[in-house]
C-alpha cells in the first residue's frame, strides 16, 4: 500500500521540485522511461506464496519505509501502524504514520474486491481521501499492483503525480512494497516499505508514534 498522508497535499523537498520543472531534463528522461516499462503483474502468476490482499491486511500490522529521489538519495523515513477490518468483500485499512522529521499523517483505505477481470486475475478498487479517483489493483501469484494518482505538496506547489505500486508477499507474515512515483512519465522517486503482520508483528504492534528515535 502507499505511504499515508494527512488530508492535504504532502510536502517534498525543493530539489524534487527543481527536478520536475526542469523541462530539458524531462524531455531527455522521457525517452529512457518509455523504453523501460515495468512488467505486467500477470507475469508473476506462478510466484509463491500466494498473496491475498484482504487476508494479509486484516487485523493489526506494522510497516517501516523510506522515500528516495530518482538518484537513490534517501529523503524520508517513516513507520506505520495499520489496522484492517474485513466485511465481506470490503477491507477498511486504517494507517497511522510517523516520519523522521516528526510529521504525523494518516490515511483510511476502503478496498473492494471486484472479482476476476478479463484475464482471469483478481481485481480490486481502492479509495482514500487524498487519492484522485479510485486506485485500480490486480493480484497475481505473490504480487499485487496498484495504479493511482495523488496530489503532493512540493515546496508550496501542488503537483499531481502517478504511483505504480507493487506489493510482494515474502512469507506468511512479511510483504515488501515498491512504489514508483512519476510525473509526465518521468520517474521522480520511489518508496520501499516492509509490512509485518500476524504473530511476527504481535510483539511490535503498536509502534510508538510519539517521536522519531534519536539514538
Task: State what each model feature region is.
Residues 3-24:
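Bacterial N-terminal signal peptides that target proteins for export
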Residues 44-60:
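N-terminal helix-cap/turn-to-beta initiation motif at the start of protein domains
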Residues 37-39:
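Bacterial signal peptide processing site
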Residues 134-186:
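A charged, solvent-exposed segment within the mature domains of Sec-exported extracytoplasmic proteins
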Residues 32-35:
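C-terminal motif of bacterial Sec signal peptides marking the signal peptidase cleavage site
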Residues 64, 69-154:
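Central antiparallel beta-sheet cores of small beta-barrel/beta-sandwich binding domains
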Residues 54, 60, 74-75, 79, ...:
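Low-complexity, acidic/polar, glycine-enriched regions of mature
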Residues 164-215:
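Glycine-rich, aromatic-bearing surface loops/beta-hairpins
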